[in-house]
Curated annotation (Swiss-Prot):
It comes from the Bacteria. This is Large ribosomal subunit protein bL21. This protein binds to 23S rRNA in the presence of protein L20. The keyword Ribonucleoprotein applies. It comes from Staphylococcus epidermidis (strain ATCC 35984 / DSM 28319 / BCRC 17069 / CCUG 31568 / BM 3577 / RP62A). Keywords: Ribonucleoprotein, Ribosomal protein, RNA-binding, rRNA-binding. GO terms for cellular component: cytoplasm; ribonucleoprotein complex; ribosome. One of its GO terms (biological process) is translation.
Length: 102
C-alpha cells in the first residue's frame, strides 16, 4: 500500500517502512507526526481525493532534524567593485513512515 501526501508545498509518494526527507517540521526527534493531507491512496483499493481523501492519514516517526549541504550564492556587478557572497543550508526533517490509515 502506498499514499501520496502533501507537505512543505511538495507531493511525496510514501510506503510503510520508508525513510523520507521533508521540509523542516516543528517536531522533536522520536515524536510521532501525522499527515492529514493525503491526496491518493493506492494498493488493493484505490482512493483518489478531491482534493484530499476523507478520513485518511499517514503516521510517521521523526528520526532526525538536520540541515542540508551548504550552497554558495555569489553575486557581483562588473567594473563596480561590488560583490556579495552568501551561504545557505536548507533545514530538513528525516522521517520513517509507520502506518497508512485509509
Amino acid at each position: 500500500m502506498f499514499a501520496i501526501i502533501e507537505t512543505g508545498g511538495k507531493q511525496i509518494k510514501v510506503e510503510e517502512g520508508q525513510e523520507i526527507y521533508v521540509e523542516k517540521l516543528n517536531a522533536n526527534e522520536g515524536d510521532s507526526f501525522t499527515f492529514d493531507k493525503v491526496l491518493f491512496v493506492g494498493g488493493d483499493s484505490v482512493k483518489v481525493g478531491a482534493p484530499t481523501v476523507e478520513g485518511a492519514s499517514v503516521t510517521a516517526t521523526v528520526n532526525k532534524q538536520g540541515r542540508g549541504k551548504k550552497i554558495t550564492v555569489f553575486t557581483y556587478k562588473r567594473r563596480k567593485d561590488s560583490k556579495r557572497k552568501k551561504g545557505h543550508r536548507q533545514p530538513y526533517t528525516k522521517l520513517t513512515i509507520d502506518k497508512i490509515n485509509a
